[in-house]
């Protein structure tokens, strides 16, 4: 029961947003969220583009400049920054689209690519964070027995696997192209135009919900629970400040994960059930549409949170930053430290 024109972005049709022309049944809902949508998206995507680009560019530059300090988590951080940069480079196109009140100006190829890039970033970020959490758990809970699992080479293979998996599983979104509406305006990021496509979107939703959110979220919770229990158990044996720092890092990472991804996936599921119910009051539908805009903006904002994750992931990145600054100021060649023993490696990984 939407008025024609209350359309949402293509990411929102993962929420089951219906074709507004075919769903105009009794014409009882005369309100739209177009103005709200255009203002929020254009503002949020502008901020995310600027902050995400400079933040991730800086982190990536520092990590590459200190690449001689080899670390498995450095590999994950670099890949996470690359995924963020690929996404934020497409967000200005979305800003232009919403500033022009839903008129696409950049051709069919960029329409497909912009839609695709946001999905790839969303789930690459989730999987990279999950991989980092898993291997951090291995390093802290089993620091000596399983130290060979947490290597730079294995991290590269994991990252390659994540890229291939996400790129292939997100490829269906490349099939959704721009089109001309009844006013001859080119549209992009809009809901599917037939019932068959809507069913396909429903299937994609549950597949991505289970494999792209539930499994990674459970993995992170289990890993961080094991880490916290291990750190608390060993508090009296080793340096308490370093243990508090590790626990604080876990809290920051978990909070960022929950703020960025959980609201979007929960809202998307609720929205699907609402749209498939027989009774859909106009005010409830409009509130749900507004919540789509808010939660989708939060999901996209993970590009801004990730640089903070790099900083709060422990002393290692801050040490890299200090090394980079000293190297830049003194123009002296950095001399790497001697190879660490297994216990030292385990402790270093705990501080990543």
From Swiss-Prot:
Residues in the Cytoplasmic compartment per record: 65-72, 143-156, 230-245, 313-352
PROSITE patterns hit by this protein: G_PROTEIN_RECEP_F1_2 (PS50262)
Organism classification: Eukaryota, Metazoa, Chordata, Craniata, Vertebrata
Main location: membrane
Source organism: Mus musculus (Mouse)
Keywords: Cell membrane, Disulfide bond, G-protein coupled receptor, Glycoprotein, Membrane, Receptor, Transducer, Transmembrane, Transmembrane helix
Annotated family: Belongs to the G-protein coupled receptor 1 family.
Name this polypeptide is given: Cysteinyl leukotriene receptor 1
Glycan-bearing residues: 15, 19, 26, 184
Tissue distribution of the protein: Widely expressed, with higher expression in the lung and skin, intermediate levels in the heart, kidney and stomach and lower levels in several other tissues. Isoform 1 is the most abundant form in all tested tissues.
GO CC annotations on file: plasma membrane
Topological domain ranges for the Extracellular compartment: 1-43, 94-121, 178-208, 267-291
Listed transmembrane segments: 44-64, 73-93, 122-142, 157-177, 209-229, 246-266, 292-312
Any further remark recorded for this protein: MK-571, a selective antagonist, was shown to inhibit eosinophilia, bronchial hyperreactivity and microvascular leakage. Zafirlukast (Accolate) and pranlukast (Onon) were also shown to be selective antagonists.
Glycoprotein among keywords: yes
Record-level GO BP terms: calcium ion transport; cell surface receptor signaling pathway; cellular response to hypoxia; chemotaxis; establishment of localization in cell; inflammatory response to antigenic stimulus; positive regulation of angiogenesis; positive regulation of glial cell proliferation
InterPro entries: CLT1_recept (IPR013310), Cyst_leuk_rcpt (IPR004071), GPCR_Rhodpsn (IPR000276), GPCR_Rhodpsn_7TM (IPR017452)
Disulfide bridge positions per record: 111-188
